[in-house]
């Protein structure tokens, strides 16, 4: 009997599927670039055929195949002229794969009817109900439905002393880690938990996320990033958000301390220089000091089981490697079209090749330093949610200023939202009246890097999510 993976491979390699899917891919990605002048005539899409294929492909364990299935269903739901029965079928496939986030987002954007399941066959609804039930957990009397990867993590954590997780960034690691943490607090007696982050820049953000999650779950616990034991240490549940250096400080000051759970985020960095060596040392020390559970989380690590070398060999261990896809990412290559300085060729890097989509036209770009801001601004064509990565803080400020000039040249009467004006007042008061951020905010632009006050960084992120800030230029921190 042919396996699901073999069947999926046969489908995606068939000439008919490749031709039909390529037409869909070009049309779908091109529609997301407003300024694109398309050079493709995708013709009519065989939606019934592609959605039927997607229903089979979602059973594959191959990440690249899952990406194809997800693209088909996402494109169907986003296609404005497509009859509702096709959209409902695509949503049903998402539901069967427990991808509830995709459904929720589609409904919130009015791309999908909230009651889509009422139009599905009875057997499909029975299968969806069984899947939702089997992937559900109860956390503090509230039911949460997990995707396949999250459910595997949750179950493995219950059955083992240590687990090592490797999955793409979009798989939902942060969500399941927070629920593991909160459920552990509920089930254990005043547990002591360490959540290790790789850099100081992440400490406050993770601490705030944990505080908010516990508050939303109505769970009482002391959450701190200060390497000093709180006064009620023995009488309360405690969560410490540390770097390895802060954990080392606590271990040196309290040689008899025991912890119950250690979560190591970005655990693959254990192989990085001297800080990785220190992390390995403190983890090994904690593992020999008592009966502590460990969770290692990494983005697509080739050998997540290697992290178990840092803890006691007697631990019951399990590694979890997943290629689960919950979102699509389009890698677009933009290059000069011949000698022209105003015409830019746009290609999609997918299916192990460059796929020609079309071109965009900009004003004449004579300076290399203006290439990123001009292309980003023209390609976005006024849409919000534009995130630009640069190498350093000074470059983030420079690109933001250039974007501001482009926006105000096109829209001289631009007025920022009330929330942005309030942020401008806060920056003037808490940082400096002449801080460059103030001027770029007036055009709906912001920059973001690690060495900024947390309150300002958080508000920038919130305004970007709301659409009050159209362009956010940031560094990796």
Residues covered by each model-derived region:
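N-terminal accessory nucleic-acid engagement/regulatory domains that precede
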Residues: 1-130, 381
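Conserved C-terminal RecA-like helicase domain
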Residues: 125-136, 149, 155, 164, ...
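N-terminal pre-P-loop "Q-motif" helix
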Residues: 142-159
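Walker A/P-loop
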Residues: 145, 160-180
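Motif I (Walker A/P-loop) of helicase-class P-loop NTPases
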Residues: 149, 173-182, 275-282
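Structural recognition of the conserved hydrophobic beta-strand(s) that form the central parallel beta-sheet
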Residues: 195-196, 240-243, 263, 292-299, ...
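Conserved interdomain linker/interface between the two RecA-like ATPase lobes of SF2 helicase motors
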Residues: 231, 284, 291-402, 446
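SF2 helicase catalytic motif II
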Residues: 244-247, 252-294
């Amino acid at each position: 009997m042919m396996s699901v993976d073999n069947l999926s491979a046969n489908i995606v390699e068939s000439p008919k599927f490749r031709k039909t899917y390529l037409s869909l891919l070009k049309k779908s990605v091109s529609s997301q670039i407003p300024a694109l002048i398309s050079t493709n005539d995708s013709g009519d899409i065989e939606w019934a055929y592609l959605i039927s294929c997607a229903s089979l492909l979602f059973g594959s364990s191959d990440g690249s195949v899952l990406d194809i299935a997800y693209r088909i269903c996402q494109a169907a739901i986003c296609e404005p002229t497509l009859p509702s029965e096709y959209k409902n079928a695509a949503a049903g496939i998402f539901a069967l794969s427990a991808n509830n986030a995709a459904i929720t987002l589609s409904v919130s954007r009015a791309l999908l009817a909230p009651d889509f399941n009422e139009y599905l066959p009875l057997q499909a609804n029975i299968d969806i109900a069984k899947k939702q039930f089997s992937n559900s957990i109860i956390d503090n009397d509230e039911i949460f439905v997990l995707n396949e990867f999250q459910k595997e993590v949750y179950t493995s954590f219950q059955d083992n002393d240590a687990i090592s997780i490797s999955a793409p960034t979009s798989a939902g690691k942060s969500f399941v880690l927070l629920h593991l943490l909160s459920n552990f607090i509920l089930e254990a007696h005043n547990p002591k938990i360490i959540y290790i982050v790789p850099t100081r820049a992440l400490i406050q953000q993770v601490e705030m996320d944990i505080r908010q999650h516990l508050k939303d779950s109505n769970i009482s616990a002391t959450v701190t990033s200060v390497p000093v034991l709180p006064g009620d240490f023995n009488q309360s549940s405690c969560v410490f958000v540390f770097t390895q250096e802060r954990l080392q400080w606590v271990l040196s000051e309290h040689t008899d301390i025991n912890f119950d759970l250690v979560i190591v985020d970005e655990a693959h960095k254990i192989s990085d220089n001297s800080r990785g060596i220190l992390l390995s040392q403190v983890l090994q020390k904690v593992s020999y000091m008592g009966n502590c559970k460990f969770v290692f989380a990494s983005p697509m690590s080739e050998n997540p089981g290697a992290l178990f070398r840092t803890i006691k060999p007697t631990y019951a261990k399990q590694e979890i490697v997943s290629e689960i896809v919950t979102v699509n990412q389009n890698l677009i290559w933009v290059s000069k079209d011949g000698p022209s300085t105003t015409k830019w060729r746009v290609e999609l890097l997918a299916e192990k090749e460059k796929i020609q989509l079309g071109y965009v036209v900009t004003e004449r770009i004579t300076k290399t330093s203006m290439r990123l801001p001009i292309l980003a601004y023209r390609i976005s064509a006024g849409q919000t949610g534009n995130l630009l990565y640069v190498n350093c803080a000074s470059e983030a400020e420079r690109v933001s200023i250039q974007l501001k000039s482009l926006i105000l040249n096109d829209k001289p009467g631009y007025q920022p939202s009330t929330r942005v004006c309030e942020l401008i007042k806060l920056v003037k008061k808490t940082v400096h009246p002449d801080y460059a951020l103030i001027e770029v905010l007036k055009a709906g632009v912001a920059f973001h890097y690690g060495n900024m006050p947390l309150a300002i960084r958080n508000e920038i992120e919130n305004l970007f999510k709301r659409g009050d800030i159209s362009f956010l230029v940031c560094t990796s921190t």
